Regions:
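Boundary-proximal intrinsically disordered activation/regulatory segments immediately upstream
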Residues: 1-66, 154-155
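Glycine/small-residue-rich loop that forms an oxyanion/phosphate-binding "nest" at active or ligand-binding sites
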Residues: 68, 73-96
């Protein structure tokens, strides 16, 4: 059973894992370096625990202690009980979900390790918005994608905002970082995958025409919001695919486009 420790001083060094959570640049560098990430909210904390992540500590306001009692009773890690005011001073924002947990990161698998057993893979290039990362992981989990590969400059899937938006789906879909870009795509092709680049370009085939759900192994490439895939990535692809649009709309945001594309890749259009 975890020790339940009441903390009244926001400067208490035991709360260091939770300081400055709104400082994106600080947390982006600090969390991977220290091997930690922050899970926020009851559902996300439970999903991280179920996925086998080790908990370093928890930070709770009083009303959440009973809600999380079963988790607390199983933990060897300390649980810090604080007032909402202290929580806000420590983290830099109003913790309206009332529960935070500092989790230990796991070593990432290599891309080749993930590709051995996968058939439907997401490949992201330069997606550096944490909200988009979280949304894409949530859709990938819901729609049956097997794994995610990230270019070296993609945002951290375990950053607090990414985890929160994904509702913990980042714990369900394994991911790895390609060491080089776009050269790293060669290893994906060598593993037997067809590289499909998602683009609104008129030269791309529609998903109905390409029928990726009938292909043996597919790696669907997604670019950043606004810019899309780079020229180098498009050149490296085996084929370009697009989502047909109506009513003068020329594109969707990357999160919405990803969900549509994942359905096309895993299932295809239902037969009428």
């Amino acid at each position: 059973m975890a020790d339940l420790i009441t903390v009244e001083d926001p400067e208490d060094p035991r709360l260091r894992d939770y300081t400055g959570l709104t400082d994106v640049e600080l947390r982006r560098k600090r969390e991977p370096a220290e091997g930690l990430f922050i899970a926020e909210g009851e559902k996300v904390i439970r999903r991280a625990k179920e996925a086998g992540y080790e908990m370093r500590s928890m930070l709770l306001s009083a009303k959440w202690i009973d809600v999380m009692r079963d988790v607390i009773d199983e933990l060897p890690a300390p649980v810090y009980a604080v007032s909402p005011e202290v929580a806000e001073q420590v983290t830099g924002y109003h913790v309206h979900r009332g529960a935070l947990a500092s989790m230990q990161r796991k070593p990432l698998p290599t891309a080749n390790e993930l590709l051995r057993s996968a058939r439907r893979v997401v490949v992201m290039e330069s997606v550096n918005d944490h909200t988009n990362i979280g949304a894409i992981f949530r859709s990938a989990a819901a729609l049956g994608m097997d794994a995610v590969l990230l270019s070296p400059d993609c945002a951290d899937p375990l950053y607090r905002r990414s985890v929160k938006v994904s509702m913990g789906a980042v714990f369900s879909v394994p991911y790895a970082r390609l060491e080089t870009w776009p050269k790293g795509l060669e290893s994906v092709r060598e593993a037997g995958f067809t590289l499909l680049a998602l683009t609104p370009d008129d030269k791309a085939r529609s998903f109905d025409e390409a029928a990726p759900h009938k292909m043996d192994r597919v790696a669907l490439m997604l670019g950043a919001e606004g810019d899309g895939l780079s020229t180098q990535a498009l050149v490296a692809a085996d084929e370009w695919v697009r989502i047909p649009m109506s009513h003068g709309v020329d594109s969707l945001n990357v999160g919405a486009a990803a969900a549509v594309a994942f359905y096309a890749v895993t299932t295809g259009r239902p037969e009428s």
